[in-house]
Amino acid sequence: MSEYQYVEHEFAPVYNEESQVLVLGSLPSVKSREHGFYYGHPRNRFWKVVAAVLGVPEPLTIEEKKRMLLAGHVAVYDVIRACEIIGSSDSSIRNVVPADIKSIVAHTPIRAVFTNGKTAGRLYKKYQAEHIALP
């Protein structure tokens, strides 16, 4: 059986002064950390779905992914800054240190926050939602 590891978030949030929608995950998976960017597992459909929603070709490189997000006014980050976790198992997450979502929202015209999974949604509600004022 795998053991718990203390993991600190390795990626900066992706946003700019024009971001209007914030998509939050829980914490980058092992594969994403190996890849060096959000949603890096080859079977993850995030980039395909966002590209389809925005009506643009699916990005292949990290720089293309960042450009697509920013051009589409989409910000991406995670609700966890650090935690203990077994592998990539969201159900094993414990001892959460929440990420600073409030400062992103304070410096952007974010109008909506979406979470991309049950754990991200639960942790957003627990640690951040009450501190975020959306229009």
Indicate where each model-derived feature is located:
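A short linear-motif detector with a strong N-terminal bias
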Residues: 1-3, 16-19, 53-57, 92-94
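Active-site and ligand/interface coordination hotspots across diverse enzymes
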Residues: 1-48, 106, 125-130
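Glycine/proline-rich loop-helix segments at beta-alpha junctions forming the active-site rim
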Residues: 2-9, 13, 83-135
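Residue-level preference for short coil/turn positions at secondary-structure junctions
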Residues: 17-19, 70-72, 109
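Short His-Asn-centered micro-motif
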Residues: 24-25, 77-78, 115-118
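Aromatic-residue detector
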Residues: 26, 55, 59, 121-124
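Short, surface-exposed acidic-centric catalytic microdomains
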Residues: 31-92
